[in-house]
């Protein structure tokens, strides 16, 4: 087969697919252009999840006719003149790829007008080709309307998600800009319904609008400077850690994914974090553009620092200093005793699980509880072996088995007074799209920005409903990757861990005997997360070690 040179139009569409991967990336690129244009009001409109139409309107400086007629062409930009400029700019877009890429794979209409012009101008570009240009009477600023995304790349359009999923990802991108630019009036509508209308305000007020479940009095402002670096943002106090992850990192106003920054944040809270607990942190790191490489990823969401160690120490120490974190090692688990007691009393579940050793199936009465050591381990003696049982892991697996076997039985508890939970638009859309909570035993309805919970599973205490729902959202986001069944198991595993007896909880010998009997009867060897439940020592091995045989 002979090697051929690809047609220019094919090359353009392939390249565009690297920059634009879905509705969310169009929204991201167009909002960035609006911010670069100095806009203090940006309106985003989505129709059918953005697959039919995406509209971004701003009141920025606008473009003259000559600029408008070249803005959709390859590598056209007003921000750099030489290659070295890409390492010294603070603007978001700069490579001249975004608008060009969008126009290559859609039907795009652009309106723009500067303050000094009497008239604005309108152009339409279809698959990268200019269809028309004409003068129009409009206000200062730019409006970009993107229709039929990937209409000319059917293979890529086929892989767009459902309307709900595409919209949810776009809303998440929009929310990041709301956090990084609270001084801008940002408005979002979906199918002509207003989702957000956020006036220019402070970061704390933005957080309040986007995260109604976070206690405002737990947020501490962060403002720190060292050498040529600055850190601004908010972080939650160590007493208000939660199971749902909410960490947003920005560099020079740009949302980024960077393991170094994540590690620095978690390091600041290291003395307080228990398993599956996270801080709420929104930080914006400012440093000279020459010390950052944003060209690691086509969408510029990954960055590299030339001063890794300095950045890590600065971010970590700034958070610790501003929060005035004391050196203590205790934080409330918030696990209701009522839930723990109820879970101890249930009968043996039907579900069976394999184990690493078939010999663990021991007659229920053929063991003896020697005692409980370090408020953590049950010591069990049988005729041939000594077992050390982690009672938290064992109890966790028993709860998991029961909950798994009760799925789809619709035996929940109706609430006399429904629980109202305020959630973000993207979170409500996620819950509405998926059926996980209803399969677990919930019944609810969505009214405006609230989830109204009317029925809960029998194993959940009403005081824990809000916490459970919020904790489950991050797992539900993974359905498209892992599938409904796996995500349901993950949620149930997390509930089991939370509800199970913990180290240092009081456990009498009768409860210990019950747990051990259930472990042997159900051939349990690991907790739902894969940790071992018990460790065994053969008496012959002990005798050999002590040279008694």
UniProtKB/Swiss-Prot annotation:
One of its GO terms (molecular function) is ATP binding. GO terms for cellular component: mismatch repair complex. It holds the Pfam family MutL_C. Keywords: DNA damage, DNA repair. SUPFAM superfamilies: ATPase domain of HSP90 chaperone/DNA topoisomerase II/histidine kinase, DNA mismatch repair protein MutL, Ribosomal protein S5 domain 2-like. Gene3D superfamilies: 3.30.230.10, Histidine kinase-like ATPase, C-terminal domain, MutL, C-terminal domain, dimerisation subdomain, MutL, C-terminal domain, regulatory subdomain. SMART domains: DNA_mis_repair (SM01340), MutL_C (SM00853). InterPro entries: DNA_mismatch_repair_CS (IPR014762), DNA_mismatch_repair_MutL (IPR020667), DNA_mismatch_S5_2-like (IPR013507), HATPase_C_sf (IPR036890), MutL/Mlh/PMS (IPR002099), MutL/Mlh/Pms-like (IPR038973), MutL_C (IPR014790), MutL_C_dimsub (IPR042120). GO terms for biological process: mismatch repair. PANTHER family: DNA MISMATCH REPAIR PROTEIN MLH, PMS, MUTL (PTHR10073), DNA MISMATCH REPAIR PROTEIN MLH1 (PTHR10073:SF12). NCBIfam families: mutl. This is DNA mismatch repair protein MutL.
């Amino acid at each position: 087969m002979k090697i051929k040179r690809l047609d220019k139009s094919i090359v353009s569409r392939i390249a565009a697919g690297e920059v634009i991967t879905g509705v969310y990336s169009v929204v991201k690129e167009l909002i960035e252009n609006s911010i670069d244009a100095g806009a203090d009001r940006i309106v985003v409109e989505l129709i059918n999840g953005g697959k039919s139409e995406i509209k971004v309107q701003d009141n920025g400086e606008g473009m003259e006719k000559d600029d408008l007629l070249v803005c959709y062409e390859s590598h056209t930009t007003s921000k750099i003149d030489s290659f070295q400029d890409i390492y010294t700019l603070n603007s978001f877009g700069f490579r001249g790829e975004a608008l060009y890429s969008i126009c290559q794979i859609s039907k795009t209409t652009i309106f723009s007008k500067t303050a000094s012009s009497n008239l604005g101008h309108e152009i339409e570009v279809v698959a990268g080709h200019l269809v028309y240009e004409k003068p129009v009477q409009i206000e200062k600023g730019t409006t970009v309307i993107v229709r039929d995304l990937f209409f000319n790349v059917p293979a890529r359009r086929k892989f767009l998600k459902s309307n709900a999923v595409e919209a949810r990802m776009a809303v998440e991108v929009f929310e990041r800009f709301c956090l990084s630019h609270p001084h801008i009036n940002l408005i979002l509508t979906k199918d002509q319904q207003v989702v957000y209308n956020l006036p220019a305000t402070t970061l704390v007020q933005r957080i309040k609008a986007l995260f109604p479940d976070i206690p405002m009095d737990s947020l501490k402002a962060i403002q720190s400077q060292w050498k040529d670096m600055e850190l601004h943002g908010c972080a939650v106090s160590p007493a208000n850690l939660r199971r749902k992850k909410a960490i947003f990192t920005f560099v020079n106003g740009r949302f980024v994914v960077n393991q170094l920054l994540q590690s620095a944040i978690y390091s600041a809270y290291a003395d307080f974090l228990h398993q599956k607990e996270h801080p709420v942190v929104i930080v914006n790191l400012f440093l000279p553009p020459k010390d950052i490489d944003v060209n690691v990823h086509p969408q510029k969401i990954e960055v590299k620092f030339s001063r890794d160690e300095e950045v890590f120490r600065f971010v970590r120490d700034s958070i610790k200093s501003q929060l005035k974190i004391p050196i203590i090692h205790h934080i409330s688990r918030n696990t209701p005793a009522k839930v723990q007691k109820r879970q101890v009393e249930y009968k043996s579940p039907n579900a069976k699980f394999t184990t690493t050793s078939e010999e663990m199936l021991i007659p229920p009465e053929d063991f003896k509880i020697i005692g409980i050591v370090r408020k953590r381990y049950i010591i069990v003696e049988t005729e041939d072996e000594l077992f050390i049982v982690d009672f938290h892991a064992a109890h966790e697996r028993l709860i998991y088995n029961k909950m798994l076997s009760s799925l789809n039985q619709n035996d929940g508890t109706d609430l006399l007074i429904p629980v109202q939970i305020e959630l973000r638009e993207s979170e409500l859309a996620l819950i509405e799209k998926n059926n996980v909570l209803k399969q677990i035993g919930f019944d609810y309805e969505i009214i405006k920005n609230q989830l109204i919970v009317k029925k809960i599973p029998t194993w959940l205490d009403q005081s824990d409903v809000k916490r459970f729902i919020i904790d489950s959202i991050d797992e539900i986001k993974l359905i498209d990757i892992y599938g409904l069944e796996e995500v349901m198991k993950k949620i149930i595993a997390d509930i089991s861990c939370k509800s199970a007896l913990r180290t240092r909880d009081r456990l009498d010998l009768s409860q210990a005997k019950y747990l051990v009997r259930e472990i042997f009867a159900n051939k349990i060897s690991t907790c739902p997360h894969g940790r071992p439940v018990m460790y065994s020592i053969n008496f012959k091995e002990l005798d050999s070690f002590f040279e008694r045989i």
